[in-house]
From Swiss-Prot:
<dbReference type="InterPro" id="IPR001021">
    <property type="entry name" value="Ribosomal_bL25_long"/>
</dbReference>
<comment type="subunit">
    <text>Part of the 50S ribosomal subunit; part of the 5S rRNA/L5/L18/L25 subcomplex. Contacts the 5S rRNA. Binds to the 5S rRNA independently of L5 and L18.</text>
</comment>
<comment type="function">
    <text>This is one of the proteins that binds to the 5S RNA in the ribosome where it forms part of the central protuberance.</text>
</comment>
<dbReference type="GO" id="GO:0006412">
    <property type="term" value="P:translation"/>
</dbReference>
<dbReference type="InterPro" id="IPR029751">
    <property type="entry name" value="Ribosomal_L25_dom"/>
</dbReference>
<keyword id="KW-0687">Ribonucleoprotein</keyword>
<dbReference type="InterPro" id="IPR020057">
    <property type="entry name" value="Ribosomal_bL25_b-dom"/>
</dbReference>
<keyword id="KW-0689">Ribosomal protein</keyword>
<protein>
    <recommendedName>
        <fullName>Large ribosomal subunit protein bL25</fullName>
    </recommendedName>
</protein>
<dbReference type="InterPro" id="IPR020056">
    <property type="entry name" value="Rbsml_bL25/Gln-tRNA_synth_N"/>
</dbReference>
<dbReference type="Pfam" id="PF14693">
    <property type="entry name" value="Ribosomal_TL5_C"/>
</dbReference>
<dbReference type="InterPro" id="IPR037121">
    <property type="entry name" value="Ribosomal_bL25_C"/>
</dbReference>
<dbReference type="GO" id="GO:0008097">
    <property type="term" value="F:5S rRNA binding"/>
</dbReference>
<dbReference type="InterPro" id="IPR011035">
    <property type="entry name" value="Ribosomal_bL25/Gln-tRNA_synth"/>
</dbReference>
<keyword id="KW-0699">rRNA-binding</keyword>
<comment type="similarity">
    <text>Belongs to the bacterial ribosomal protein bL25 family. CTC subfamily.</text>
</comment>
<dbReference type="GO" id="GO:0003735">
    <property type="term" value="F:structural constituent of ribosome"/>
</dbReference>
Amino acid sequence: MTDFALNAEVRSDLGKGASRRLRRNAAQVPAVIYGGDKEPQSISILAKDITKLIEDEAAFSHVITLNIAGATETVLIKALQRHPSKAAVMHADFLRVVADHKLSAVVPLHFVNAETSVGVKQQGGEVSHVISEVEVSCLPKDLPEFIEVDLAQVEVGQIVHLSNLSVPAGVELVALAHGNDLAVANIHASRVKEEGAE
């Protein structure tokens, strides 16, 4: 598991104009830390640092250490605002993490054995991904980087639901806890094969 860290500075000059100046003159991204029992804190991060961090998909489902003026905060990325036509991050929202409090986070699903599954390799079907990420609830130490969806034994016409997933100990799927056993993926008959049978 990779450790993620960012250096940040406390930001006292607030507002839309101040944020624009920060992005333009200092190549920094304005950000805010929310949550916990503390007041929201306005910070700034070097644009190149946050851009490099988010190149790794795992950064979105990992606890990140923010180094701010000699102190540290453990956070999750809650939201990113991006430029409409560039890949640049315009603003970031972080959520404070408290070690002994459960948190909710969205983690990606990694689909494995799709091409070698019974439904694809032996029955000529095609995999259809219904969702690509899922919300989990757990303690920060238990937060998974991703949840694996093994399609090896899935046949044509079968659907994989949240209840079929193997999740790490201490991790709860939020939708399932609320009685929503969502479809995750399925294998359906190939359209080419269907047309050939007509």
